[in-house]
Amino acid sequence: MTDFLDRRRFLGACSATIAALVVPSQRAFALPASPHPTPRPGITGAKVLTADKLADRPRLVSLFDSIRKIPEVVDGIHCNCGCTNPPELYSLLSCYENGMARDCAICQGQGRLAVRLHGEGKTLDEIRAAIDAKFG
């Protein structure tokens, strides 16, 4: 029996170490949870990016279309990636209006979760709690 690592074990150990140290999870970049905003009266999904603005990201079209259908829910959710920190950005809905959600996995993840839970009949408070548990 030898006391040294063969090449396969060495590369496996190196890969695991690099992954643990260098590849941070999305949650590592998420900011501490802030209070969720109150959905604005009369808010619509009219400003959510449409398929023509997502031509280079066709896999996101259905997500943006789904967000457009539930603006009163998504406008009541704080985005945990930090994009709603500038004063002109109010809620997770803002991320889908200004295009931040095109490239941000946290915005997309929160949006997908909100759409799924809303489809299951969950209330805004239940959706917020689930988002806080996963992303907060």
Question: Can you annotate each of these PLM segments?
Answer:
Residues 7, 57-60, 124:
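Short amphipathic alpha-helical segments that mediate assembly, nucleic-acid/protein binding
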Residues 24-62:
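C-terminal segment of N-terminal export signals and the immediately downstream linker at the start
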Residues 124, 128-136:
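Short flanking/linker segments adjacent to small metal-binding domains or redox-active Cys/His motifs
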Residues 64-79, 90-99:
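Immediate flanking context of iron-sulfur cluster ligation sites
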Residues 1-21:
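N-terminal secretory signal peptides and thylakoid transit peptides that target proteins
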Residues 40, 45, 90-91, 135-136:
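Mitochondrial intermembrane space
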Residues 85-120:
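Iron-sulfur (Fe-S) cluster-binding segments and ferredoxin-like electron-carrier domains
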